[in-house]
């Protein structure tokens, strides 16, 4: 039996232990088969599997297996991994509860009915999708998404209802319109027209939109970058939409290629309601490590940099920052990416949305930016103030979490100095705190690995000769009396996409 120490977030006190046998790892491994990703699970052994050397080797192999799984955000955020590492909090039948909430909400709506669920097409465990139809126009396919409130939900129910009503009336040529939406004290749902071509990520990965998220994106067989002209055009359109939202006091904070669809060569942003519901951003494990990314505008710009990278190279950025862009990257686009996702940019500060719109790469008069739909978004003074306070609290929590991570990093560095006798390089890059990437790995954005603090140093040895002889004798005695048979197998922590951390011991 292996003991796994699991840690959530940067604080060691938020940790617990679970006990797993090899067969539990096999069950977890089988849950990943739909991904098609080769994972190094150590093979089963029938004879000699109680040999101590074999157990020690298997412990190392299982730790490596856990490390690789937890570095991949798609695998790490899957329900199978959550239940493996935190069975007490993830045994709830999430999908059944979501269906109950949706059914209750639609009872008062005579025009809509649920047709069938579309399971696991998104990355959020608590977000569930259903195919619904409007009885007035039954031929139109609609997609309903239900999600529970997140940790940044700061509005009361009355303010939330007013904000939702306002968001439902929003119109913009580069933002997907909403057919119907509702919320309660548990969560909310939004109904939009179903785009059969799928998201921008589906387009890049040549994936069918209704397939499971893990199957579509963990190990895509055919990825294709977009033409540079399309990257510039779509980038400009995204920036126009972001600028509009910020001017109206509704920052996005949830930009990624899965929240963008392309219709008639025009982008449409999805899930603009996520911020009001208090949901964490897809790229939060990345930008929480950079103290210069403290405003929601900086968050949107940073996420925009990742989307640009994915469009031009055909795959997500596997690091929190990128300092080695391909030499094939066009020079103008290179300057944009370097101003957003380079280590230097994340240390010194990112450009504003307005500055990016004026960049030569996007500011090209040949782009067809004409559109017939006139932007519209109005709300009451009370709703405007409620939104402002919610964003203010969201930014405050981000700053507090960044401060906590920096303090934890500083503590680890000090312990390394004392343990190794030399100071490691200080850096704000996530690479300084992990052995791998941040919000994706072998495929999409990885999660930063956070290692627990080193064990405390032993008390100082007495400076007297007598004390030194006594302690030396005690140490030699301990070495001579050491019994290897008393050792027990173990594995050690790595952090997951939402901050959970599993280490065998």
Over which residues does each language-model region extend?
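Phox homology (PX) phosphoinositide-binding domain
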Residues: 1-153, 162
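Short beta-strand micro-motifs within the conserved protein kinase catalytic domain, predominantly
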Residues: 177-188
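Activation segment signature within eukaryotic-like protein kinase domains
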Residues: 234-235
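Catalytic-loop of the protein kinase fold
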Residues: 242-263, 269
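C-lobe/activation-segment region of protein kinase-like
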Residues: 268, 274-335
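Terminal C-lobe "cap" of eukaryotic-type protein kinase domains
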Residues: 344-370
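Regulatory extensions appended to serine/threonine kinase catalytic cores
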Residues: 368-460
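Long, intrinsically disordered low-complexity linkers enriched in proline
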Residues: 426-505
């Amino acid at each position: 039996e292996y003991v796994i120490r699991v840690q959530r977030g940067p604080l060691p006190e938020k940790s617990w232990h679970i006990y797993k046998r090899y067969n539990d790892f096999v069950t977890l491994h089988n849950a990943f088969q739909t991904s098609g990703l080769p994972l190094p699970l150590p093979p089963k052994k029938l004879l000699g599997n109680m040999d101590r050397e074999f157990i020690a080797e298997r412990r190392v192999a299982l730790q490596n297996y856990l490390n690789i799984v937890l570095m991949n955000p798609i695998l790490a955020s899957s329900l199978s991994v959550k239940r493996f590492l935190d069975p007490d909090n993830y045994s709830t039948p999430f999908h059944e509860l979501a269906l109950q909430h949706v059914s209750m909400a639609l009872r008062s709506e005579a025009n809509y009915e649920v047709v069938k669920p579309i399971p696991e097409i998104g990355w959020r465990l608590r977000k569930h999708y259903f195919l619904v139809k409007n009885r007035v126009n039954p031929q139109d396919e609609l997609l309903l998404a239900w999600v529970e409130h997140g940790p940044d939900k700061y509005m009361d129910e009355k303010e939330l209802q007013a904000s939702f009503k306002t968001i439902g009336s929003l119109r913009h040529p580069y933002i997907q319109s909403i057919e119907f939406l509702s919320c309660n004290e548990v969560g909310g749902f939004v109904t939009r027209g179903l785009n059969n071509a799928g998201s921008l990520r589906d387009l890049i990965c040549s994936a069918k939109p209704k397939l499971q998220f893990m199957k579509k994106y963990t190990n895509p067989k055919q990825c294709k970058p977009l033409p540079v002209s399309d990257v510039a055009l779509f980038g400009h359109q995204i920036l126009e939409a972001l600028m509009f939202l910020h001017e109206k006091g509704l920052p996005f904070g949830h930009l990624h290629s899965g929240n963008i669809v392309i219709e008639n060569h025009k982008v449409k942003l999805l899930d603009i309601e996520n911020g009001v519901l208090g949901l964490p951003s897809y790229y939060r494990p990345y930008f929480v490590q950079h103290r210069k990314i403290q405003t929601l505008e900086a968050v949107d710009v940073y996420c925009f940099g990742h989307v640009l990278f994915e469009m031009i190279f055909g795959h997500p950025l596997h690091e929190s920052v990128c300092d080695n862009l391909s030499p094939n990257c066009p020079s103008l686009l290179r300057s944009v990416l370097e101003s957003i996702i380079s280590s230097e940019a994340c240390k010194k500060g990112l450009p504003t949305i307005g500055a990016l719109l004026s960049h030569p790469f996007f500011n090209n008069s040949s782009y067809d930016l004409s559109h017939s739909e006139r932007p519209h978004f109005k709300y009451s003074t009370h709703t405007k103030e409620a939104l402002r306070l919610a964003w203010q609290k969201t930014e405050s929590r981000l700053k507090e979490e960044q401060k906590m991570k920096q303090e934890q990093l500083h503590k680890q560095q000090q312990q390394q100095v004392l343990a190794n006798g030399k100071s490691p390089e200080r850096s704000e890059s996530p690479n300084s705190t992990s052995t791998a990437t941040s919000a994706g790995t072998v495929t999409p954005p990885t999660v930063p690995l956070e290692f627990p603090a080193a064990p405390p140093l032993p008390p100082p040895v007495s400076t007297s000769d007598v004390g030194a002889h006594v302690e030396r004798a005690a140490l030699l005695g301990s070495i001579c009396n050491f019994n290897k048979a008393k050792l027990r197998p173990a594995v050690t922590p790595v952090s997951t996409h939402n901050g959970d951390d599993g280490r065998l011991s």
